[in-house]
Regions:
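Phosphate/nucleotide-binding catalytic core
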Residues: 1-186
């Protein structure tokens, strides 16, 4: 396999007036993501989630993210020209956008804390707060302790992102230090 990098960021959907639910607009699911060139699209709670085909280089990584986001925008515009995606960490959703049972699904898979080795508590839908996040996927063949890789990512990615992301609401649900989901590829 060699070393590869991928990601699955989430974005909110908006119309001309406000942030809306992406349920029924995006298509695709965790079990059956919608294939597009360079990756996938799917609904995740009220958000749109993109996934990219794992990249071998930094250039490939950037190109694939840009490509899939462009296809998401085209898809949204084909439904309604006022629809677009918006990159922000959290939003308080109107009740009307939380009617679907899918809007109450949080944390499809358990995640763990690399520092403690313990499973993190699964977020519960207690308010209308929804948060956008995502994961960096790192694939490798090396016999390296996954938790040590995650700890290194905390230092190289996590600490700088704390300076960039000033949204305290998102941190209430996701994105704590050392959070990861074990995968067979790394």
């Amino acid at each position: 396999m060699g070393r590869k990098i991928g990601c699955d960021p989430e974005v909110f959907i908006r119309d001309s007036a406000s942030i809306i639910s992406g349920i029924g607009i995006i298509g695709g699911s965790k079990e059956h993501p919608r294939p597009v060139e360079d990756g996938t699209l799917q609904e995740d709670n009220v958000l749109a989630e993109i996934g990219i085909t794992p990249a071998d280089t930094e250039d490939q990584f950037v190109i694939r993210i840009t490509s899939v986001l462009s296809q998401l925008r085209s898809h949204l515009h084909s439904i309604d020209p006022s629809l677009d995606f918006v990159v922000q960490a959290s939003a308080m959703m109107d009740d009307m956008h939380l009617i679907s049972p899918a809007a109450m699904m949080f944390g499809c898979e358990p995640d763990f804390n690399a520092w403690t080795g313990l499973q993190n508590p699964r977020p519960q839908p207690t308010t209308n707060l929804r948060t956008a996040g995502g994961h960096v996927h790192i694939g490798y063949d090396d016999e390296v302790d996954k938790r040590e890789v995650i700890k290194a990512c905390d230092v190289l990615i996590g600490l700088p992102s704390v300076l960039m992301d000033t949204d305290a609401d998102r941190m209430k649900l996701y994105g704590g230090p050392g959070a990861y989901r074990p995968k067979p590829y790394g």
